[in-house]
């Protein structure tokens, strides 16, 4: 097993927090959204909750394997302002844009970890490459939703 790189552990911890926060926000949004136009978005978000939790489990296990400590709820740092429930539960576009912002940030984080672990920690890199592919899939799906919603 490679010696734990503090930068990699810090970035993995950020990714772990982001995955959990995304799952929490997807859960809230999949319940709070209202309206006929919201149904497909709610279904997509509800389906992605388990994927995001699965990502957090993979990342958390890797943090532990590298000698780090997986954070508990009191030390998590959440900051997805754009994914917070809207006062208007029919504002589907705001939710879609929040998902896009969240997935874009996750993609940046995984790309950072992939670069930090390149040539040093192939297991971490492999986990992040696979997770990156999932996040890119989520981003593509919600970009497609946004295109449809922004048509006039």
Spans of model-derived segments:
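Iron-associated oxidoreductase/ferritin-like identity signal
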Residues: 1-152
């Amino acid at each position: 097993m490679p010696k734990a790189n503090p930068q990699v552990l810090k970035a993995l911890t950020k990714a772990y927090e982001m995955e959990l926060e995304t799952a929490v926000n997807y859960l809230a949004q999949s319940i709070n959204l209202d309206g006929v136009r919201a149904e497909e978005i709610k279904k997509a978000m509800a389906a992605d909750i388990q994927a995001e939790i699965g990502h957090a489990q993979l990342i958390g296990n890797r943090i532990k394997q590298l000698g780090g400590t997986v954070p508990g709820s009191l030390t998590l740092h959440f900051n997805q302002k754009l994914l917070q429930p809207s006062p208007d539960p029919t504002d589907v576009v705001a939710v879609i844009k929040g998902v896009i912002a969240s997935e874009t940030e996750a993609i940046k984080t995984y790309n950072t970890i992939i670069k930090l672990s390149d040539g040093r920690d192939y297991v971490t890199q492999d986990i992040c490459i696979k997770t990156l592919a999932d996040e890119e899939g989520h981003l593509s799906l919600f970009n497609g939703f946004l295109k449809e919603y922004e048509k006039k």
